[in-house]
Amino acid sequence: MGWAVSLIATLGLAGLVVSTNDVLTRQQGDAFARKVVAVQDHANTGAVTQRATSFTQAETNSYLKFNAAELLPTGLTEPSLTMHGGNRVSGNAVIDLDVVRQKQSSGGWLDPTSYLTGKLPVTASGRVITGDGNGRIELERAEVSGVQIPKSFVNQLVNFFTRTADNPRGSTVDDVFELPANIRRIDVEPGRFTVHQ
């Protein structure tokens, strides 16, 4: 399941707003989880047949709300995504900037975390570009509490939230990343995304 949250986070980095039409339920979150298991099982069997699995926006956001809380990094809460199509994604999360500042702030006057404190809404939008088992993010816009922020600050947040035991240095928005579970590409359509293995 860990790669599923990473995949959602990747989509979310292109757009860190749930549509008002989405009704989120635990059942939809569970449906998302079952699909993740099926995608991983397909990868584990070493099957050579191609397979496409679609995840709806409601399933994705239900999973984030009901199933993924313990999988999210400390300091990141209430994530949600809107899938626009054309591989465009937007989304938001509440970020505890005090946690970010305590762990990685330089404390300098040019460090944005020196001025921003508390839990603030962060929004972003962009495109997810994938193919041949790799992906990258094309960031279009990001904001903290409605104020546009520079890409360097987005990179600082991404770097902080992507640090793991396997990736202790973290990542940036500009990094090319390998897609998990033998996924070759991801297509984002209005209200859903499809992974192709």
Task: Outline where the language-model segments fall.
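Extracellular/lumenal and peripheral-membrane lipid-interaction modules
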Residues: 2-6, 10-197
